[in-house]
Structure formats: C-alpha cells, structure tokens
Amino acid sequence: MALVAYYIRTETEGILPTKDEQMAAVLAYAAEKGHDLVAHYEDIDAPGLLLYHRPGLKEAINNIKELEDWEVLVVAEPRCISDTESALHEFVHKLSLYGNRLESPARPWEDFLADMRSYRRAMSRR
C-alpha cells in the first residue's frame, strides 16, 4: 500500500472533467489500488500551461522536495497536470528525481516515465 496524494485542476473552459468527476475517478482508482490517501491539492479554475503559477501544484512539489509525506500523486487524467506535453514531462522528471511517481486511471507510472525519457532523448538531439 502506497501513501498517496491527489491533485485536482479545473479550468474555466470546461475542457477538463469537473472537480466532482475528478474526485470520483481519483478516489475509485486509489481504492482499487489499495492506496492510502494522505493529502490533496487543488487548483480550481487554473489555466493549464504554466505549472509554477498554480499554488496547489507548487505545494505538491514542495512536499516531494521537503516533507516527503507521500509517494504517489494521483490525477484523474494526465492533462489535469498540464495542457502541454513538455510541462507534463518536466513534472514527471521532477517526481522521478525525488523517488515519487504520478499515476492516473488512464496511464500508469511506467508509461509516464517512458514517455518522459523519450521526450528528453528527442530534446537532447536538437
């Protein structure tokens, strides 16, 4: 059983699932995996491009650097982290550096990690 936090982001355009839909997906996923929920972070009506302009996500990042209260951050969908692949890969890289991971009902950690590594290899060839 892993100690987990969950993150919810909504935005004003209505592209992402609602807060209630995200919470239901995250809680169902955590229960299915046997995870122990210990924290949550939210950014309501937050744009999806810049990671560091969101207080909830900044708090989660601070936790992985300083407090180490949890091992896994669960999101309903990968785009709840960011609308851009590069920002998502940056976040996955940061989690991997600190021994944490990102999980979603739509995508396991191994896929996030493999995609991030492929992206970083492609960027290093430029």
Model-derived regions: residue spans:
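Short, structured surface patches at the beginning of a domain
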Residues: 1-126
